[in-house]
Amino acid sequence: MEDIADFTLGITPYDKYRGHDKDTIKKRLFHSDTKIDSTYKPLITGENIQRYFIDNKIKEYIKYGEWLGAKREERFFNEPRILIRQIISGKPPRIYAGYTEESLYFTQIGFGIISKKESINNKYILVILNSLLMNFYHKYMYLDLEKDLFQKILIANCKKLPIREISLEAQQPFIEKANKMLFLNKNLQELSQKFQRLLTRKFELEKLSTKLQDWYLLEFSEFVKELKKSKIKLFLKEEMEWEEIFLEKKEEADKVKNEIEMTDKEIDGMVYELYGLSEEEIKIVEEN
């Protein structure tokens, strides 16, 4: 893959070998909760990097410039690019590769990729990286199969992933699928965040639990239990009203989620064909 793309690690904000003293490092002097001036850039976390899309919700800014430990090339924070989350998760563990054209900066929570060939589209690379086949390959080539938590994708290993070079015309169906996945995931994110804002506003919650953030994955009874954990008790009439709201919004989210899953399977089929897998080989990939 390093033959077709440029890579960068995330920013290293602080480095004692670059002259940063203990006070600067301890107080995180280059970080801020607000955009103080034009040198402060929006900083994402690993959670922002999802499969196919990058959540642009910002909690922090970083003062970007020569004073940083390692500032990296600025094009990796502004140009159309792929971002890979360093920590991979799930059962089986999956690569989280997202695409963005927004001005977003990141530290060592991941790394960036930009195609260095006009004949290779970033979105084509994105689809291959998120495919089941490439996840299978990465898992058995580079991961510790005995370890469940905190597995990582390393930039050195990503550079070795076998991305097939095909014509721009042949890439077009993959690019179209990438665009569809970007649209669907953004739609799901907006639906989810709208409901989260409703919960936060209605119940005056400072922060939602992880399960409440993923409310559309819950059944209504589980949703009520999560509210109770946040010390929110619904009276019978309120519960009936919330059940109607919850089920309506969950149905909307499920429709989008199902379309994402269906498109994912279509992509996997296209990638199997691209790499010439037999039926037996496909079965091995999908069962593992």
Language model feature labels by segment:
Residues 1-176:
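Polybasic, glycine- and aromatic-enriched phosphate-binding surface used to engage nucleic acids
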Residues 1-25, 47-49, 160-288:
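Non-catalytic DNA-recognition/assembly elements of restriction-modification systems
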